[in-house]
């Protein structure tokens, strides 16, 4: 039966590395403290002349090629980001469409913070299985450095830049089995990008987070969510080939891994080298596993994410891309 399948995965990783040692020179922190609390050792930072759309475009071109398609085969572009090129418009998706030479196609952004890629999978699955679209390009892209206060040691240590992309199309096998998304806006003030309005045309954005509260809710929510999606689909955790979570904090990842009783071999962890890249983190981690030969065609994959909003989600899929 023809159903939605993730036919490719790719990423773009900026060259510049911002290490914990570098941050020690910028704010009152230490490599030991950052590593112990987060598991992060370094993160990537885009250059000044790279916008979020540029990062997304580079990942998109690789994803399209790996799906054995051309840009003109794409009939919808969906982007998840909390760091768009422009504050209101045009959308980052429209900028990427322009970069790819595409017009007269659907292109829009969604705002679901770190859960963004899960939300994209759900939307792309619905679009292709309804027959409205054939090949949907989904992109998580972030230049979080553009909204980061590098004087705030509580948050600047966490985030990095990057992009990941994939193509969702119909296929007879290796389907996106299930996607679950949810939200609770009552906790919105615990993790937000605050707007400080200097004038009607001049605004400064900065990310703010109450980390301890976010940590507790994230662990409980994600642990319950992954258990529920597995039970709903009559799948045992031990049947999962790879668990690829949002890369926010090593302690959160390990807590959910322990809940599922999964071995380290089945858990993909990249937070140590990229930090939290928000909506880009899952596809970036997937691409690392793909290029390392760990993610193969037909593998059963469990994804999960939690982000500002609060938003969260999980997905079960059999990877439909050709082996690297």
Curated annotation (Swiss-Prot):
Predominant location: cytoplasm
Residue span of region ACP-binding: 247-251
Sorted UniProt keywords: Acyltransferase, Cytoplasm, Fatty acid biosynthesis, Fatty acid metabolism, Lipid biosynthesis, Lipid metabolism, Multifunctional enzyme, Transferase
Gene Ontology MF annotations: 3-oxoacyl-[acyl-carrier-protein] synthase activity; beta-ketoacyl-acyl-carrier-protein synthase III activity
GO BP of this protein: fatty acid biosynthetic process; secondary metabolite biosynthetic process
Keyword Acetylation: no
CDD domains per UniProt: KAS_III
One Pfam family here: ACP_syn_III_C
Pathway field: Lipid metabolism; fatty acid biosynthesis
A Gene Ontology term for the protein's cellular component: cytoplasm
Source taxon at top rank: Bacteria
Catalytic center residues: 114, 246, 276
Catalytic activity: malonyl-[ACP] + acetyl-CoA + H(+) = 3-oxobutanoyl-[ACP] + CO2 + CoA
EC number(s) per entry: 2.3.1.180
Subcellular location: Cytoplasm
Quaternary structure (record): Homodimer.
Family: Belongs to the thiolase-like superfamily. FabH family.
NCBIfam families in UniProt: fabH, PRK09352.1
Function: Catalyzes the condensation reaction of fatty acid synthesis by the addition to an acyl acceptor of two carbons from malonyl-ACP. Catalyzes the first condensation reaction which initiates fatty acid synthesis and may therefore play a role in governing the total rate of fatty acid production. Possesses both acetoacetyl-ACP synthase and acetyl transacylase activities. Its substrate specificity determines the biosynthesis of branched-chain and/or straight-chain of fatty acids.
Domain text: The last Arg residue of the ACP-binding site is essential for the weak association between ACP/AcpP and FabH.
Protein name (record): Beta-ketoacyl-[acyl-carrier-protein] synthase III
Name of the coding gene: fabH
């Amino acid at each position: 039966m023809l159903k939605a399948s993730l036919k490719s995965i790719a990423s773009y990783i900026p060259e510049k590395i911002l290490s914990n040692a570098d941050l020690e020179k910028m704010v009152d922190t230490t490599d030991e403290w950052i590593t112990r609390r987060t598991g992060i050792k370094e993160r990537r930072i885009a250059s000044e002349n790279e916008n979020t759309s540029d990062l997304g475009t580079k990942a998109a071109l690789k994803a399209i090629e790996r799906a054995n398609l051309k840009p003109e085969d794409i009939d919808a572009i969906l982007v998840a980001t909390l760091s768009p090129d422009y504050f209101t418009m045009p959308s980052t998706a429209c900028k990427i469409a322009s970069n790819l030479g595409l017009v007269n196609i659907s292109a829009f952004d969604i705002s679901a913070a770190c859960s963004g890629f899960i939300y994209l999978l759900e939307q792309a699955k619905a679009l292709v299985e309804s027959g409205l679209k054939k090949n949907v390009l989904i992109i998580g892209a972030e230049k979080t450095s553009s909204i980061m206060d590098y004087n705030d040691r509580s948050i600047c240590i966490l985030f990095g830049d990057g992009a990941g992309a994939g193509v969702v199309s119909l296929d007879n096998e290796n389907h996106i089995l299930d996607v679950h998304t949810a939200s609770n806006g009552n906790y919105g003030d615990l993790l937000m990008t605050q707007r400080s309005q200097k004038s009607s045309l001049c605004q400064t954005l900065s990310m703010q987070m109450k980390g301890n509260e976010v940590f507790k809710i994230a662990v409980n929510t994600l642990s319950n969510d992954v258990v529920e999606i597995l039970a709903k689909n009559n799948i045992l955790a031990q049947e999962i080939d790879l668990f690829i979570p949002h890369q926010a904090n090593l302690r959160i990842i390990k807590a959910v891994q322990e809940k599922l009783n999964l071995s380290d071999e089945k858990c993909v962890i990249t937070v140590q080298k990229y930090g939290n890249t928000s909506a880009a983190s899952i596809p970036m981690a997937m691409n690392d596993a793909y290029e390392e030969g760990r993610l193969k065609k037909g593998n059963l994959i469990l994804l999960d994410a939690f982000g500002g909003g609060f938003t969260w989600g999980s997905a079960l899929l059999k990877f439909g891309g050709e082996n690297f």
